[in-house]
Amino acid sequence: MKYTFHIVDVFSSMGVAGLAVLGMTATLAGAQTVEVKEKPPLYRYVSSWTFPPPHSADPDKDGSAGNQKILAAALADGTLVGYGDEENQVHSAERFAHASWGQARSIARLMKVVDALHKGGSSSTPLDSSTRHWDQIYITSFYNWKAGSWKGAYVYAGTSKLKPDAPDADDAIRALSSFYVPVFEKMLADGIIVEYEIDREMIHTTDARAQIHFSLVVPNAEGLDRFRDALGVALDQNSLIVPAFGSMMDNFKEQFDFVKVNATYK
């Protein structure tokens, strides 16, 4: 997919891992960045599976109604602020095919829903038991969304590993957000995206060094070109961002996902 490859190249070239301790101030001084206020922490629980086609589009038809009932109730009473399910559009042997997630303003609220899903949601199937699966919990203080539901929206998501000698993930995210949050906020106001977040792994079941994760939700296919164009303009106007944030990434080995999502935000 030529279109997706172009977007990956844009993010890959700038790198999202952070800034070196030495030279951080000097590098950012010439770039157009602003101080961004951190929001209260937001927690995101993600369950991923590598369901083989044709199951990847809807791997749990029998149990999805039970899950949706629990998630909708949790959103209505304020336990969750968002939830959704995703299907990867560019399949590979290493990456997930299907993922489900929920967002809450505390770990306690998040795990309350996870526990309810385990007890009263869909039951395990032979396909579930034979499929590779992993869970991750992310935390972020840099995020925003538009309330509502979107079916068949698109998500660009990327994960970058920090070098062993890099600043910690929180410092890297703060530096990253000084450029990206204003860009994403403008996209949100213009209707190009309906949600964004820049976060790090808090708890995970994969063996990896500290990681930074970003994701953006584009409401429809027509918005994909608008997103690409707006991001390209922002990067062209801030050329120093590329070397600044690329300096701490682990050999430019990002992981990127281009997925379709059904998402609801409160």
Task: Locate predicted features.
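C-terminal segment of classical bacterial N-terminal signal peptides
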Residues: 19-30
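Compositionally biased, low-complexity segments enriched in small residues
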Residues: 3, 21-23, 127-128
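Short S/T/G/P-rich N-terminal loop/turn motif that feeds into the first structured element of a domain
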Residues: 30-119, 126-266
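Bacterial N-terminal signal peptides that target proteins for export
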Residues: 2-18
